[in-house]
Amino acid sequence: MLMEDGGLDTTSEEYRKLSKAERRKRRRATPKYRNLHATRERIRVESFNMAFSQLRALLPTLPVEKKLSKIEILRFSIAYISFLDNLLQ
């Protein structure tokens, strides 16, 4: 039985009677679902990258223009937080 979004109702009796290969074939996402998922993923990645940019802007590194990888940003952040913590103690 098809659902409103064009996908197959996996709880239906019709679906359970299909072989494993047929079920796998029918479970493929519809183009509409794939587009929605791609859009959500793109927004998630943009948000993630924006957070890294904001974190990068707070790090005192020289030169400021130097491009850092995400792992470098995280490692420098850890080191900087440790440094600031030591200053307070």
Curated annotation (Swiss-Prot):
Record CDD domains: bHLH_TS_HEN
Positions of region (Helix-loop-helix motif): 46-84
Disruption phenotype: RNAi-mediated knockdown extends mean lifespan and reduces expression of bcat-1 by >50%.
Domain bHLH, chain residue ranges per copy: 32-84
Tissue: Expressed in sensory head neurons of the lateral ganglion.
Keywords noted in UniProt: DNA-binding, Nucleus, Transcription, Transcription regulation
UniProt GO cellular component terms: nucleus
TM stretches of this protein: none
Segments of skewed composition (Basic residues): 22-32
Disordered as annotated region, ranges: 1-32
MF annotations from Gene Ontology: DNA-binding transcription factor activity, RNA polymerase II-specific; protein dimerization activity; RNA polymerase II cis-regulatory region sequence-specific DNA binding; RNA polymerase II-specific DNA-binding transcription factor binding
Location of this chain's protein in the cell: Nucleus
Function: Transcription factor which binds the E box motif 5'-CA[TC][AG]TG-3'. Involved in modulating physiological aging, probably by regulating expression of branched-chain amino acid transferase-1, bcat-1.
UniProt protein name: Helix-loop-helix protein 15
Lineage, highest ranks first: Eukaryota, Metazoa, Ecdysozoa, Nematoda, Chromadorea
